[in-house]
Amino acid sequence: MPVTDSIADYITRLRNAGRAKNKTTDIPYSKLRENISQLLLEKGYIKGFTVITTEKFPFIRVEMKYTAAGVPSIKEITRVSRPGRRMYEGKDIKKYLGGLGLYIISTSKGVITDKEAREQGVGGEILFRIY
């Protein structure tokens, strides 16, 4: 079944895997999803990911990260810019939760966090926020 909003599908799969305490979750592959996974890995929200190519279709296997008490490291993940209402921000991007959380932004320089966008002086489409 075709998905109209691939980013919303991606974050929903991560959210559901965390709530179900799954070790891994499989997500259909796209270059944007791979870039987002790399960013989440660098920021410590996921344990790791691998791109798996099969005869039918490629997918990304994301390893979920949990605390010692079994609490998911992704406490909240919410889509901001949607297909029906795109949200763009200039180079003066505000901090999410006073800097405790992150906005993930698609810019001309790739997919980066709000902090990196402020440092580089670029704006873009706010894909989602994560805490």
Curated annotation (Swiss-Prot):
One of its GO terms (cellular component) is ribosome. One of its GO terms (molecular function) is structural constituent of ribosome. Transmembrane segments: none annotated. InterPro entries: Ribosomal_uS8, Ribosomal_uS8_CS, Ribosomal_uS8_sf. Keywords: Ribonucleoprotein, Ribosomal protein, RNA-binding, rRNA-binding. One of its GO terms (biological process) is translation. It comes from the Bacteria. PROSITE patterns: RIBOSOMAL_S8 (PS00053). SUPFAM superfamilies: Ribosomal protein S8. HAMAP family: Ribosomal_uS8_B. Part of the 30S ribosomal subunit. Contacts proteins S5 and S12. One of the primary rRNA binding proteins, it binds directly to 16S rRNA central domain where it helps coordinate assembly of the platform of the 30S subunit. NCBIfam families: PRK00136.1 (NF001109). Belongs to the universal ribosomal protein uS8 family. This is Small ribosomal subunit protein uS8. The lineage of its organism: Bacteria, Pseudomonadati, Chlorobiota, Chlorobiia, Chlorobiales. The gene is rpsH.
